[in-house]
Amino acid sequence: GILLDKLKNFAKTAGKGVLQSLLNTASCKLSGQC
């Protein structure tokens, strides 16, 4: 249903956000710019 679709989209968006921040943290640590 609609609720399930909303939950799926939310999970996708949240997952992307987490991945993005992990990547940002990793790259700043590697370059020593944290």
UniProtKB/Swiss-Prot annotation:
Keywords: Amphibian defense peptide, Antibiotic, Antimicrobial, Cytolysis, Disulfide bond, Hemolysis, Secreted. One of its GO terms (cellular component) is extracellular region. Transmembrane segments: none annotated. One of its GO terms (biological process) is killing of cells of another organism. It is found in: Secreted. It comes from the Eukaryota. Its main location: secreted. InterPro entries: Antimicrobial_frog_2. Expressed by the skin glands. Disulfide bonds join C28-C34. Belongs to the frog skin active peptide (FSAP) family. Brevinin subfamily. Shows antibacterial activity against representative Gram-negative and Gram-positive bacterial species, and hemolytic activity. This is Brevinin-2Ec.
